[in-house]
């Protein structure tokens, strides 16, 4: 299929994508895709030598091959699920963090799916990335250095009602949209699964921290207002 699955911003300096952007809807989260039939491997759209070598196992140390777009977000077909196992979608993620707090956040995001499309950007922030001084690193199975992210984030955008039948760029009233971002320190969080308001920031603040501009499809006249707002309770977070 030539349908777009997701979009990523790959940085060969860290052998990982700085962000992965994708639409989310119930059409994507149900179907025949089965992760038991998916294999970790290279992304055919990027030179192999630029990617982490993950086909023979995970990163060395206590790191999982952490998905940015979760496999569970692409059950609609085996092909789309398989693509979530490409190395360009992976980062070295602390095992406890991945399996507990981050995994809970991924599930929370799926619970925010509505009839209109939910737009998601998942990202990894590497402190020191721009001056090549990233202190924390691991290696892959080919002994390539793989920096470990300092923070992970998710940015979300959808309509408030969830059933408008409109695309984002058709909406000219900021009160019809809601946006938020989650910013989590990448650490061994043990069995902690709590997502709280302290983990939430505005999309505008996320843009300041990362240097990226998210959700360009928002009408320019309302973009700033939408991105400044961040109401955790609207997203089931206290």
Predicted regions and their residues:
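Domain-level detector of nuclease and nuclease-like folds
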Residues: 48-238
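Short, His- and charge-rich active-site/binding loops that engage polyanionic ligands
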Residues: 3-68
């Amino acid at each position: 299929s030539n349908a777009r699955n997701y979009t990523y911003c790959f940085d060969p300096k860290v052998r990982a994508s700085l962000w992965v952007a994708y639409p989310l809807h119930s059409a994507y989260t149900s179907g025949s895709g089965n992760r038991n039939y998916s294999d970790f491997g290279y992304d055919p759209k990027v030179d192999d030598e630029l990617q982490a070598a993950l086909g023979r196992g995970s990163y060395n140390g206590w790191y999982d091959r952490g998905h940015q777009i979760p496999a569970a977000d692409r059950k609609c077909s085996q092909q789309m699920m398989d693509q979530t196992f490409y190395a360009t979608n992976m980062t070295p993620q602390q095992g406890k963090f991945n399996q507990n707090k981050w995994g809970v956040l991924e599930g929370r995001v799926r619970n925010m799916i509505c009839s209109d499309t939910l737009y998601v950007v998942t990202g990894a922030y590497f402190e020191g990335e721009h001056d090549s001084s990233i202190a924390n690193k691991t290696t892959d199975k080919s002994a390539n250095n793989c920096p470990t992210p300092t923070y992970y984030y998710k940015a979300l955008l959808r309509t408030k009602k969830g059933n408008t039948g409109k695309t984002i760029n058709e909406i000219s009233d900021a009160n019809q949209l809601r946006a938020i971002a989650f910013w989590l320190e990448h650490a061994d969080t043990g069995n902690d699964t709590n997502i709280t308001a302290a983990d939430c920031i505005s999309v505008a603040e996320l843009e300041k921290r990362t240097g990226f501009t998210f959700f360009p499809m928002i009408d320019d006249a309302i973009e700033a207002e939408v991105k400044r707002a961040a109401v955790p309770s609207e997203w089931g977070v206290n």
